[in-house]
Amino acid sequence: MSWARDEAGGVVLELLVQPRASRTRVLGEHGGRLKIQLAAPPVDGAANAALVEFLAEALEVRKQDVVLVRGETGRRKAVRVTSVSAARAVAALVH
């Protein structure tokens, strides 16, 4: 998948995030990125915190292992997850 690439020690996920949705869920690939809807609003970092929590739970890693690399204030984000391969991330996030 073009939205998940292996890097030293983990994977980088290219995401398109839609905050303030009715529920938090993965919608699928959209324009080369994985689209994720978040129930949290984009206020005071709530959506970013919800994204980190969602990814940590889905990938079965600690929240500290999920780091926002790019896109703190935008919808297009890059997230690094340590100790996870791209193949494992794809399997866990795309059902």
UniProtKB/Swiss-Prot annotation:
Signal sequence extent: none
Highest taxon above the source species: Bacteria
Recorded GO CC terms: cytoplasm
NCBIfam families the UniProt entry points to: DUF167 family protein
Family: Belongs to the UPF0235 family.
HAMAP family: UPF0235
Protein name: UPF0235 protein Anae109_1126
Organism: Anaeromyxobacter sp. (strain Fw109-5)
